[in-house]
């Protein structure tokens, strides 16, 4: 559902072909308007992890966490230049229209801000208190070059040797995360072939609730600081947003 919605937004604002990588092709083609995708690429996930997902401040569920296919993006993409997007990253403008002409091999987000513009989540600044800068794997541009091939091979190596790198970089989790592996790869390579995505990564946390979508306007209930279960209304207009509360995103897409 999220992938189909995002594909429509990408085609509206960026006017580029969209392909979907999924572990279950039939689930897409049997239940959703799959014609929005130019290609559907099936690749089975081998993950056995589960993760807690919040739906606002007072509700949560523990669900399967599939994140082992991102290192295979170089191998799977049918394009010479690729924009990778998580399905909970909502495109509401044409900010990315020029990224396909970048002179860099890879573009990533480093700087980020919460939709309130004043909450400060330190976990998105560095991958641990004593470690390296945080780079987002949510939204990535890459070209098919020898350097990029090496970059993604390094990402896969980090994934396979995750316990070693988690210890080396003093991480407080033993569950593999793409954001962390991309950050580690950037630190290891320290290359001018890696650049930054335009603008700033704008996000809402999974303790916030998306309660309305009106074209390119997103309306949220944002958790108040130190006020459990209390919210303030915030909206964004024509801004790309990483909506971490996937449950509320699904509900709003379902009502459209």
Feature locations, PLM:
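Short amphipathic alpha-helical segment that frequently serves as the phosphate-/nucleotide-binding helix
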Residues: 1-8
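A glycosyltransferase accessory/donor-loop signature
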Residues: 4, 35-36, 130-142, 146-256
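Short, acidic, metal-binding catalytic loop of nucleotide-sugar glycosyltransferases
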Residues: 9-16
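Short, hydrophobic beta-strand segments that form beta-sheet elements in well-ordered domains
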Residues: 17-24, 83, 107-108
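Short, polar loop motifs at secondary-structure junctions
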Residues: 22-28, 45-46, 91-93, 200
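Active-site-proximal specificity loops/subdomain of glycosyltransferases
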Residues: 27-77
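Short, surface-exposed amphipathic charged segments that create phosphate/polyanion-binding patches used
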Residues: 52-63, 120-126, 211-215
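GT-A fold catalytic core of metal-dependent nucleotide-sugar glycosyltransferases
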Residues: 66-118
